[in-house]
Amino acid sequence: MGNYQDECHLKEIHQLAEEFERCRKLLLALGDENRQHLILEMMRMGQCEGVRVGAITEKTNLSRPAVSHHIRILKEAGLLKVRKEGTKNYYYFDADTEAMDRLLQMLAHAKEIMEHRPERK
């Protein structure tokens, strides 16, 4: 019976690994300290219509190219969108809820596996 439990547990672990892989872009975007700081500063600025790179640069200790780099990663992860007004770009939060749902499901699955993992001897 122990073999069957181990096989079931391994299947769960492999499924979790696949779920984790699907969440990597979002995890990488959120996992960087500079991007976390950038997100917090944008939230503190609280401008629903969007924020320009220059305004973010003023609030952080990051250069303009660094802010642009981090914004690109956050956009690719589905956390930010851009609104264009002529030549001006305004960045705002508009998260990809499907990506967030996948992340929440992956975390719930990981918790479930940890709560029901086989006992070690």
Question: Where are the regions that the model predicts?
Answer:
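Alpha-helical residues within the helix-turn-helix
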Residues: 57-58, 69, 75-76
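N-terminal helix-turn-helix DNA-binding core of bacterial DNA-binding proteins
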Residues: 21-63, 87-99
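Base-recognition residues in the alpha-helical recognition helix of bacterial helix-turn-helix
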Residues: 40, 69-70
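Conserved H-loop
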Residues: 66
